[in-house]
């Protein structure tokens, strides 16, 4: 299935989401969170080898780091969006793999993004991104969660490593209004980063291929048809356990749904 081309933002602003491969946690303790914040800080405040400032690669308007995924509201400046996100992902994955003595992919192969073309949606996303921990049951209030950019808005003098262009946000909406809105739940009509069934199926395929390559050295899911039954069944069970449905396994491997059902039950 061909990948759908990313939509281009008229404003240069995008909502980006990165998620751990197989939805695994990508932040295990505070040191991990701080490392990622530092990487974001370096993106907006780059320096050359001698420590002299370079033009900023991007503007970041808000972020939120959750245990197995993260959100960014970002505008690319001197580099393409894909290059910026790739740079962030590689820097963090290198740190994470070294610290935890692991190999292979850390993030899903393809990050999610959507263009932000109007002011109303920009404000909706500021609220949505900061409300993620509340919606996920990790905090009662936006201000209680330590790993989002909200502290940069509410208490900038307490922020140890500023990342966001908060002034660009408060030039569009007053701080008083933002504070009153940020803990107000979004309506169900505020659709944020929805993806079609085809896009979800494509992401499952990419996750499965990465999983098979990393753990079993298998580059094509249809290779499972030629494996000894015991090994094939063990791999199918592992893939099903990571969340791939029997229907999707059948489509990708060429095995019948009945065969897969017997293998994973």
Please identify what each model-predicted range represents:
Residues 1-62, 66, 75-265:
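Short Pro-Cys-Gly-centered "Cys-loop" motif that presents a nucleophilic cysteine in a tight turn
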Residues 69:
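Short acidic-rich active-site patches of cyclic nucleotide enzymes
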């Amino acid at each position: 299935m061909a990948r759908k081309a990313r939509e281009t933002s008229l404003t240069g602003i995008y909502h980006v989401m990165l998620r751990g491969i197989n939805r695994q946690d990508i932040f295990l303790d505070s040191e991990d969170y701080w490392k990622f914040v530092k990487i974001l800080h370096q993106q907006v405040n780059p320096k050359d080898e001698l420590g002299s400032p370079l033009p900023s690669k991007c503007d970041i308007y808000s972020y939120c780091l959750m245990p197995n995924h993260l959100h960014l509201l970002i505008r690319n400046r001197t580099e393409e969006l894909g290059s910026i996100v790739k740079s962030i992902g590689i820097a963090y994955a290198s740190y994470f793999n070294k610290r935890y003595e692991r190999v292979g992919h850390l993030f899903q192969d393809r990050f999610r993004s959507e263009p932000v073309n109007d002011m109303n949606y920009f404000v909706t996303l500021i609220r949505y991104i900061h409300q993620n921990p509340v919606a996920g049951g990790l905090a009662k209030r936006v201000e209680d969660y330590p790993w989002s950019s909200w502290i940069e808005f509410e208490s900038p003098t307490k922020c140890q490593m500023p990342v966001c262009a908060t002034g660009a946000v408060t030039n569009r909406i007053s701080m008083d209004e933002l504070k009153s809105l940020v803990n107000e739940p979004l309506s169900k009509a505020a659709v944020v980063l929805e993806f079609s069934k085809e896009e979800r199926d494509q992401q499952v395929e990419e996750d499965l291929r990465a999983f098979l390559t990393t753990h079993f050295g298998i580059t094509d899911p249809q290779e499972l048809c030629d494996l000894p039954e015991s090994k094939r069944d063990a791999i199918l069970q592992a893939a099903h356990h990571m969340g791939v449905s029997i229907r999707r396994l059948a489509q990708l491997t060429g095995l019948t749904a009945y065969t897969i059902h017997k293998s994973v039950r």
